């Protein structure tokens, strides 16, 4: 039987401060809520980092738990977009920034 690679989801987040600190806060809260084994299964990783925006990835099976951990961390982090590929995530992020400039 073939072993399939697990599916991933990419999340674009806005945070205050360093992106490494935000990722560590997400991982720490995830461990507190669901345990270290679940945190390893979630495979939360930093893909790209910017000044206030970052892209993180996690496994699809653990996505809901990751979103709960993001919601419950302090300082708060906002999830802008979510996608299965980085290319589509960039498009959605661009749509978000276009919409934000139209509103302002």
What are these language model-derived features?
Residues 88-104:
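Short, low-order "capping/linker" segments at domain edges
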Residues 42-50:
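RNA-recognition motif
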Residues 57-64:
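Helix N-cap motif at beta-to-alpha junctions
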Residues 26, 66-74:
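Short amphipathic alpha-helices in soluble, non-transmembrane regions
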Residues 75-87:
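Conserved short beta-strand edge segments in small beta-sheet-based binding/regulatory domains
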Residues 8-10, 51-54:
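Short, surface-exposed beta-edge/turn micro-motifs
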Residues 3-20:
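Short glycine-/aliphatic-rich beta-strand segments at the starts of folded cytosolic domains
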Residues 19-40:
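Short amphipathic alpha-helix segments
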